[in-house]
C-alpha cells in the first residue's frame, strides 16, 4: 500500500529555519537522549547534509541525515552518503514512516551516488536494513595488546578533518571515510566526549577513546610491528586497538556496517574498513 505522507527533503532555507532546527533537535533528544549541547554540534553542518523528514500536523515526527562520504578501493574512489541518526517518535512508529523515507532516499540517490552506507545501532537492525538491499560489506579488526610502559606518551591533537583524511587515504587501501567537511563534524562529536586524534610520532596517528582504547592507528600494514612497539612504549595495561587488518594472532575480524552498492563494484572488493561510526 502506498503511503500518502508529507515527505520532505529539507531545502537549504528550511535547514536554516529556527523552528525547523528546534524540531530536529527535539526529535533527536527525545529518541536518543543526548544533550542539546551535543546535538547542536550538528547545526552548523546542516547545510551540507541532506535531511529527510516526515511531518504530521506541521511537526517533524521522523527524520534522518545523509552525510557526504567516500569509499576508497585501491586507487579508486566512490562517492556516497552515510545514513545517520534515523529517528521516529515512539507514538508514530509502526506506521512505515522510516521505511518510506529510506526508500525515497534510495530512489533519489541511486542515479547520483555509488553507494549509501550505514552502521546499525544494534545487531538486530541488520536484518531490517537488509530489506532495502543493504549488505554487510564493512568490517574492522579488534586486537587486545598488553603494554607495560611507565610512560604516557603525549602527542599533538589534530582537529582538521582534511589532515585526518589525508593520513588515512595514504595508509589504507580499502576504507570508508567521510568527506573533509563531514569529518570535521565527526571530530567535533568525538571531542565532545574527550576523544581525539593525536600524532604520536612521524607515522602513527591514534584516535584515543579513553586512553585504554586506541580507536584507530593510522599505519600501513607493513608498519604494524612498529605500531605495536609504539603502543607498548607509550601505555601500560591492556589496550584495545581497532584497525583495518589483523596485526597479531588475537586480532578478531568484526562486522561494522552495511552498504547499498549502486555501483555493483564495491561488493566485489571483499569489503571495506569502517571505523568512524556515527549512529
Please identify what each model-predicted range represents.
Residues 2-23, 152-166:
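A short beta-loop-alpha structural element at the N-terminal edge
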Residues 20, 24-72, 172-196:
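Active-site rim helix/loop that mediates acceptor-substrate recognition in acyltransferases
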Residues 53, 59-70, 80-87, 117, ...:
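Conserved beta-strand in the GNAT
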Residues 78-90, 211-222:
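Conserved acetyl-CoA binding element of GNAT-fold acetyltransferases
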